[in-house]
């Protein structure tokens, strides 16, 4: 994507962001994890990395003042923006009408907490592209992947440490419950690093891009809830062997060992060495 690609969508400059925030009486809050992107080059980069197509319907969580929304609209069929702050949600259509009038019809705004939504209006989203609030990034991604089976792919900007965890593989230092759970839904990879200076206010941490590609869940007789219960138990005491960590889940250490052996997993191993298919097998053998 080049400058000309967004010729009909005038992207927000740092001055635009501060002006809009002042007009709305917005002071970014840590409670909502608000850090607004002020660099047009960064939002172009996100759209490029997201590999969206003209057929994609994008769900964007936390559009804020509209920096990424404006960059997305010329390149996709539709954007459903989910915004928890009523002031920002109310202002976004006007910002799009001013900066990208040719694409204003492609936008729908839903005023809601993304963690609490139970449905979205049609057309159903095929892609998740968002600068996610740091404090809810992992729960939001997992909730939307579970809620919206239509989601085929996505790209999210999150805290660098969260990006590392989401993309970690079994055996990696950062591998944990989020890594295992997201693997139930998608293949995940790091897609780049983002510096602090592209945000206002400047955060205390760096950010990273994470790309997602939907894939089938592991073949298993166990439900997602049952598998995730094993994951949670395994990582609640990650320094312990699985025999010990899963003792409460199974009812006793002996029962945990029996379930692990039935699943073909060494009871002396730790959760950080297992993939999501391993956790699914263990769930199938719960006493």
UniProtKB/Swiss-Prot annotation:
Purpose: Specifically dimethylates two adjacent adenosines (A1518 and A1519) in the loop of a conserved hairpin near the 3'-end of 16S rRNA in the 30S particle. May play a critical role in biogenesis of 30S subunits.
GO cellular component terms attached to this protein's record: cytosol
Localization per record: Cytoplasm
SUPFAM superfamilies according to UniProt: S-adenosyl-L-methionine-dependent methyltransferases
EC number of the protein: 2.1.1.182
HAMAP family noted in UniProt: 16SrRNA_methyltr_A (MF_00607)
Pfam families referenced in this protein's UniProt entry, alphabetically: RrnaAD
Record-linked InterPro entries: KsgA/Erm (IPR001737), rRNA_Ade_diMease-like_C (IPR023165), rRNA_Ade_Mease_Trfase_CS (IPR020596), rRNA_Ade_methylase_Trfase_N (IPR020598), rRNA_adenine_dimethylase (IPR011530), SAM-dependent_MTases_sf (IPR029063)
Transmembrane feature ranges: none
Signal peptide: none
Similarity-based family: Belongs to the class I-like SAM-binding methyltransferase superfamily. rRNA adenine N(6)-methyltransferase family. RsmA subfamily.
Protein name according to UniProt: Ribosomal RNA small subunit methyltransferase A
GO molecular function: 16S rRNA (adenine(1518)-N(6)/adenine(1519)-N(6))-dimethyltransferase activity; RNA binding
Binding site for S-adenosyl-L-methionine: 35, 37, 62, 83, 113, 131
Principal place of residence: cytoplasm
Keywords: Cytoplasm, Methyltransferase, RNA-binding, rRNA processing, S-adenosyl-L-methionine, Transferase
Catalytic reaction annotation: adenosine(1518)/adenosine(1519) in 16S rRNA + 4 S-adenosyl-L-methionine = N(6)-dimethyladenosine(1518)/N(6)-dimethyladenosine(1519) in 16S rRNA + 4 S-adenosyl-L-homocysteine + 4 H(+)
